């Protein structure tokens, strides 16, 4: 089944790490549909200039108006996808002025478009790249605690050559199992990547054998073969630090974590969001997949 991704693009055409990640991660990008999304800031200096024009994408499927910088960024994004052998007709472009704030706008678009993932960039200096123009901690908390978050979010720093495979964090929760399901679905035809189910022991006394068994069953529904699945545990007081250290040591391309759904208490959601926020500040080399 083709995957459908929403990729954010800003005026900063020199930094398109979200595009760089998907171009390096997927073996057959032509199986996927990519929507390039640009949201103009209401106070952007060139919003009122006469040089704004309708985007005429390769497939004629674009909507909205563009600033000069956004046009350059989208042109570069198209060129990157072409070099990755993605058919141009499988690309859609959208652009519009900020409506309810960029966090809410991107979540609304992600929900309405029924995307499999929303893909953002991230600077190694711990700032979410160009898109939100806020600190990583503030943006992560805004996203994670927002009740409209229904679509997995990928936060992607500049990819490092040679990285591969996905580390999926499991703790027995429904949120973690949703992360397992998301990874299995995304990697169902990407057999160049293995999946490692990872649990951080912290004295809670959870049944890891049962936890891994249930996660493996989910992966098998996506036709992930047994030889592509690994299980690992580690001990650590700081869950986020332990996850990040393991991902760095074994050079994973991505780390997937689950978020509790809206039926969980706000306190649980905020606490789990704190772990995710901490991971965001540590994602210098691997992408972070946050699954609601």
Located regions from the model:
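Structural beta-alpha unit
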Residues: 1, 41, 79-118, 123-125, ...
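Short, well-ordered alpha-helical microsegments
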Residues: 15-16, 103, 176-177, 239-241, ...
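N-terminal membrane-insertion helices
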Residues: 70-78, 212, 216
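Hydrophobic anchor at the start of a short beta-strand
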Residues: 34, 88-94, 153, 195, ...
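Small/aliphatic-rich secondary-structure junction motif
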Residues: 1-59, 162-230, 252, 282
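Aromatic/hydrophobic pocket-lining residues that form π-stacking "cages" and hydrophobic walls in ligand
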Residues: 22, 77, 106-107, 183, ...
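A short acidic, glycine-rich active-site loop
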Residues: 56-72
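Gly/Ser-rich helix-loop-strand patches that form or flank binding pockets
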Residues: 4, 27-28, 103-160, 249-292
């Amino acid at each position: 089944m083709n995957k459908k991704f929403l990729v954010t693009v800003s005026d900063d055409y020199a930094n398109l790490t979200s595009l760089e990640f998907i171009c390096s991660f997927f073996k057959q990008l032509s199986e996927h549909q990519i929507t390039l999304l640009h949201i103009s800031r209401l106070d952007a200096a060139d919003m009122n200039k006469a040089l704004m024009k309708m985007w005429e994408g390769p497939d004629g499927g674009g909507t909205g108006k563009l600033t000069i910088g956004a046009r350059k960024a989208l042109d570069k994004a198209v060129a990157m996808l072409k070099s990755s052998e993605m058919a141009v007709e499988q690309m859609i472009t959208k652009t519009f002025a900020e409506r309810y704030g960029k966090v809410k706008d991107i979540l609304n678009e992600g929900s309405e478009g029924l995307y499999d993932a929303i893909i953002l960039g991230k600077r190694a200096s711990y700032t979410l790249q160009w898109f939100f123009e806020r600190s990583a901690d503030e943006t992560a908390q805004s996203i994670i605690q927002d009740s409209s978050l229904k679509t997995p979010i990928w936060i992607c720093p500049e990819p490092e050559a040679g990285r591969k495979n996905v580390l999926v964090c499991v703790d027995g929760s429904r949120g973690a199992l949703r992360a397992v399901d998301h990874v299995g679905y995304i990697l169902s035809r990407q057999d160049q990547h293995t999946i490692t189910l990872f649990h951080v022991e912290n004295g809670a006394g959870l049944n890891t054998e049962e936890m891994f068994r249930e996660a493996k069953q989910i992966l098998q529904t996506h036709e992930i073969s047994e030889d592509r699945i690994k299980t690992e545990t580690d001990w650590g007081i700081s869950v986020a630090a332990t996850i990040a250290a393991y991902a760095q040591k074994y050079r994973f391309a991505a780390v997937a974590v689950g978020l509790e759904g809206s039926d969980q208490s706000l306190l649980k959601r905020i606490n789990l969001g704190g772990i995710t926020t901490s991971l965001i500040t540590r994602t210098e080399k691997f992408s972070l997949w946050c699954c609601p």
